[in-house]
Every structure is written in C-alpha cells, then in structure tokens.
Amino acid sequence: MEFGLSWVFLVVILQGVQCEVQLVESGGGLVQPGGSLRLSCAASGFTFSDHYMDWVRQAPGKGLEWVGRTRNKANSYTTEYAASVKGRFTISRDDSKNSLYLQMNSLKTEDTAVYYCAR
C-alpha cells in the first residue's frame, strides 16, 4: 500500500510540473507614430523548439486579432503575418533562449494594443 501511494503522488507531481507553461511578454512602451518597438516573450514549461509560436493583440475595446506566426525548425522557421502588419512587423525566435520576438516598425496609432505571445 505504501508503494502504491508513493507512485500516485509522484505521477501527480510530474503532471503538475508538465502543465506549468509560462509565457512572459516584455518590451512594451509608448512611441510616436512611425516609431519602433521590440517585444520579447520568454517561454518555459514546454519544449519551445517543437512548437509554432504566434503573436496576437487586443486593441482597446476590441477582440483578439492574430498578428503573425513563426513555425518550428522542422518547418524551416517560416513566418506569416496578418495583412495589417505585413512588411512592418517581423517575428523571430531563439530556440537556445526559449524566446520569441516581435520587431514592430513604422508603428501606427491602430497598432495600439496589448500584445500576447501564444503557443
């Protein structure tokens, strides 16, 4: 009985650790129209290099809008973008640092939003 309880406890602990996915964004700020900003997203709790990663945003009073995506190494790290940001925004990643980036150039007032990275 003691062995069985220990085994169940171990499984619960491992499942808890596995579910602790964290994505922490940084780098926002106030800039004038035409300016630039670079956002970062630090990932943990999963094998970052295996996953496609997306940026989405939510403008004040509006719903979520997809910004763009970078695929994983197996898919050549290819990227795609929403029409509204294509040519101005660039998504990159550094698998060695478990980090995702969003370089935003030629910013417009309509780019004002809360930006989120997503797996």
UniProtKB/Swiss-Prot annotation:
Signal peptide: 1-19
Subcellular location: Secreted; Cell membrane
Secreted found in the keyword field: yes
Ranges where the record places region Framework-3: 80-117
UniProt cross-references to Pfam families, sorted A to Z: V-set
Region (Framework-1) residue spans: 20-44
UniProt keyword annotations, A-Z: Adaptive immunity, Cell membrane, Disulfide bond, Immunity, Immunoglobulin, Immunoglobulin domain, Membrane, Secreted, Signal
Cellular component terms per the entry's GO annotation: extracellular region; immunoglobulin complex; plasma membrane
Cysteine pairings via disulfide bonds: C41-C117
SUPFAM superfamilies, A to Z: Immunoglobulin (SSF48726)
Single GO term (MF): antigen binding
Region (Complementarity-determining-2): 70-79
Segments of this protein annotated with the region Framework-2: 53-69
InterPro entries linked to this entry: Ig-like_dom (IPR007110), Ig-like_dom_sf (IPR036179), Ig-like_fold (IPR013783), Ig_V-set (IPR013106), IgHV (IPR050199)
Quaternary structure note: Immunoglobulins are composed of two identical heavy chains and two identical light chains; disulfide-linked.
Protein known as: Immunoglobulin heavy variable 3-72
Organism name: Homo sapiens (Human)
